[in-house]
Amino acid sequence: MPKYIAIALAGLAAFTAAQPPAALGQGGLDRRLQAAKRIECTFSVLGTGTWDKNVPAITVTPAEIKANFFDINIDEGTAEAESAYGASFISVRYESGYLHIMQMSDAGPLYLTTVLARAAGEGKLMAVHTRIEYSPTVIPGFTSRPEMYLGTCTIANPG
């Protein structure tokens, strides 16, 4: 995919995120997201950053990852994540139609998932997942460069 398309996608994501949800008639989604106790996410597009001969570059590829969060408590700023890699510290913040879920590993990496109070069809909400991690060696199947995923989440409150 040409570099200008990747730049256009990043610009579109930033523009979309900058729009207040209530202004677009999405106040109900805003309230549902604020009350969420469980979020199930699927991400299908990946932008991977690197420094090619010390020049920043990004590649965009299809992806298939899931991220599920439960016991979300906005008042306490906490949540739990389903993970094959063990527990990590999670901090949650909700503000003006954005639910931010920040995971910090004691090994250094930072993961941030943001769910927007924006409809993405079929009961889904727009979402962005980033992984800030760097390793000099690229290991297939593991994060070794900064990554940004675009996808959707559903509110799956127990009921």
PLM regions: where:
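Hydrophobic/aromatic beta-strand elements that line small-molecule binding cavities or substrate pockets
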Residues: F69, L112-A120, L150-I155
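Bacterial N-terminal signal peptides that target proteins for export
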Residues: M1-A8
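Edge beta-strand at a domain terminus
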Residues: S135-G159
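Contiguous, well-ordered beta-strand patches that form the walls/edges
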Residues: E76-Y111
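Bacterial N-terminal signal peptides
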Residues: A8-T16
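Boundary at the C-terminal end of the N-terminal hydrophobic targeting segment
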Residues: A18, A22-G25
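Short, solvent-exposed loop/hinge segments that bridge or flank secondary-structure elements
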Residues: D30, A35-E80, P109-T114
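Internal, hydrophobic beta-strand segments that form the core of beta-sheet-rich folds
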Residues: M126-E133
